[in-house]
Design a protein with these regions (language model features):
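C-terminal catalytic/acceptor-binding lobe
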Residues: 2-3, 22-24, 30-39, 193-269
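Hydrophobic targeting segments
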Residues: 16-22, 43, 55-59
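Short, solvent-exposed loop/turn segments at secondary-structure junctions
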Residues: 25-28, 64-65, 92-94, 123-125, ...
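Phosphate/oxyanion-binding active-site loops and adjacent basic polyanion-contact surfaces
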Residues: 28-36, 69, 91-99, 126, ...
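Short, acidic, metal-binding catalytic loop of nucleotide-sugar glycosyltransferases
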Residues: 38-53
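Active-site-proximal specificity loops/subdomain of glycosyltransferases
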Residues: 63-114
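Short beta-strand-to-loop acidic/aromatic patch adjacent to the donor-nucleotide binding site
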Residues: 114-125
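Conserved catalytic core of nucleotide-sugar-dependent glycosyltransferases
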Residues: 125-202, 206, 211
Length: 269
């Protein structure tokens, strides 16, 4: 655990490399609406593809029959020369098996290739200069928490003297719209992902991730989260619950906004 929670601030000048990992599926095959193209439009509007922050994007495709919903990705790869990859499955996955497959992939990546994983959903909004702001926050605070989140729909607590970070009870964590962790963290959920209790009560990926860590490290009570949130859940239907209903699901109430740059890269010292 000492390699994960180092309690050390990362120098602002140090160059980190991130993997943005996004599980996805052709939602029309799950009685929901495809929205990932709008997510990428938001990424573009936020300046992500022109950012100097070093990151790759991997889409973990859930074994959809029709994968043409991802054809638009080629436009971004051609226009911006960015590393955007699609990791396909040869069988139909659900949210839990696909996330487990994502963790297995991350575990096989050479050690120290990525500094942090940014686990996101395929239906999110992001703030302006998202990568610059995320990079600044991660360098200052991510080493003080087993995992962190830049999307915070649950209760948090102020930390004296800190403006852009708050504490949350780990037991309250849910929503993987923007979860931050070091690659070696995946070893824990991989070990217990299909625990009988999770299967019996049909836990979703966020709850399994959280409780795999809590099960191993019972002394861990808090996580560090951003304030305000840099990411918002679109909340436009669900491929997990097979519905097209708008505004049925979780959402945070402290999202900074798609047109706002919170300037963490200037304000976080």
């Amino acid at each position: 655990m000492n390699n994960i929670i180092t309690n050390k601030i990362i120098n602002k000048e140090e160059k980190l490399k991130y993997l943005i990992a996004i599980p996805c599926v052709n939602r029309t095959e799950r009685n929901a609406l495809n929205i990932i193209d709008k997510t990428f439009e938001g990424f573009e509007k936020a300046g992500m593809f022109e950012s100097e922050i070093d990151f790759d994007i991997i889409l973990f495709e859930s074994g959809s029959i029709d994968k043409s919903y991802l054809n638009f990705i080629e436009e971004y790869k051609t226009k911006y020369k960015k590393n955007i990859f699609i990791y396909e499955s040869n069988k139909k996955e659900n949210a839990n098996t696909n996330t487990h497959r994502m963790f297995l992939y991350i575990r096989k990546v050479p050690k120290n290739y990525y500094d942090f994983i940014v686990w996101m959903d395929d239906d999110v909004f992001v703030c302006q200069k998202f990568m610059e702001n995320a990079d600044a926050w991660i360098k200052k605070y991510a080493n003080f928490s087993f995992f962190s989140s830049l999307y915070v729909p649950y209760r948090t607590y102020f930390i004296n003297g800190s403006l852009n970070v708050q504490h949350a009870d780990m037991s309250n964590f849910y929503g993987t719209c923007c979860t931050i962790f070091k690659p070696e963290v995946v070893n824990l959920p991989i070990q217990n992902w299909f625990w009988q209790h999770f299967e019996l009560f049909n836990f979703n990926p966020d709850a399994r991730f959280r409780d795999c860590i809590r099960k191993k490290f019972t002394s861990l009570k808090k996580i560090c989260v951003s304030y305000p949130s840099l990411v918002q859940h679109m909340n436009i239907g669900s491929s997990i619950y097979n519905n097209k209903n708008v505004n049925k699901g979780h959402k945070c109430n402290n999202f900074v906004g798609v047109d706002v740059d919170p300037k963490f890269y200037e304000n976080i010292k």
